[in-house]
């Protein structure tokens, strides 16, 4: 009986892990509520914005397999839970 229970627990965990897909916010505005389902292998949500004083902040949000590299005058934030890139 214990073996059957353990087998069911392992199968459940494997099935849940295989079926999980990350969701991230994806829009160019400061306040965002558009949700995007990431592709298989994309395990990171990110938000990038630059600090140009005259033009204001320009936001880029999305999914990635790794955290994007920061460019000069750019801030990059990465996280790995659903809709964490607000």
Curated annotation (Swiss-Prot):
<dbReference type="Pfam" id="PF21947">
    <property type="entry name" value="Toxin_cobra-type"/>
</dbReference>
<feature type="disulfide bond">
    <location>
        <begin position="38"/>
        <end position="63"/>
    </location>
</feature>
<keyword id="KW-0008">Acetylcholine receptor inhibiting toxin</keyword>
<feature type="disulfide bond">
    <location>
        <begin position="79"/>
        <end position="84"/>
    </location>
</feature>
<dbReference type="InterPro" id="IPR018354">
    <property type="entry name" value="Snake_toxin_con_site"/>
</dbReference>
<keyword id="KW-0629">Postsynaptic neurotoxin</keyword>
<keyword id="KW-1015">Disulfide bond</keyword>
<dbReference type="GO" id="GO:0005576">
    <property type="term" value="C:extracellular region"/>
</dbReference>
<dbReference type="GO" id="GO:0090729">
    <property type="term" value="F:toxin activity"/>
</dbReference>
<keyword id="KW-0964">Secreted</keyword>
<dbReference type="InterPro" id="IPR054131">
    <property type="entry name" value="Toxin_cobra-type"/>
</dbReference>
<keyword id="KW-0732">Signal</keyword>
<comment type="function">
    <text>Binds with low affinity and weakly inhibits muscle nicotinic acetylcholine receptor (nAChR).</text>
</comment>
<protein>
    <recommendedName>
        <fullName>Long neurotoxin homolog</fullName>
    </recommendedName>
</protein>
<feature type="disulfide bond">
    <location>
        <begin position="67"/>
        <end position="78"/>
    </location>
</feature>
<feature type="disulfide bond">
    <location>
        <begin position="27"/>
        <end position="32"/>
    </location>
</feature>
<keyword id="KW-0872">Ion channel impairing toxin</keyword>
<comment type="similarity">
    <text>Belongs to the three-finger toxin family. Ancestral subfamily. Orphan group II sub-subfamily.</text>
</comment>
<dbReference type="InterPro" id="IPR003571">
    <property type="entry name" value="Snake_3FTx"/>
</dbReference>
<keyword id="KW-0528">Neurotoxin</keyword>
<dbReference type="InterPro" id="IPR045860">
    <property type="entry name" value="Snake_toxin-like_sf"/>
</dbReference>
<feature type="signal peptide">
    <location>
        <begin position="1"/>
        <end position="21"/>
    </location>
</feature>
<dbReference type="GO" id="GO:0099106">
    <property type="term" value="F:ion channel regulator activity"/>
</dbReference>
<dbReference type="GO" id="GO:0030550">
    <property type="term" value="F:acetylcholine receptor inhibitor activity"/>
</dbReference>
<feature type="disulfide bond">
    <location>
        <begin position="24"/>
        <end position="45"/>
    </location>
</feature>
<keyword id="KW-0800">Toxin</keyword>
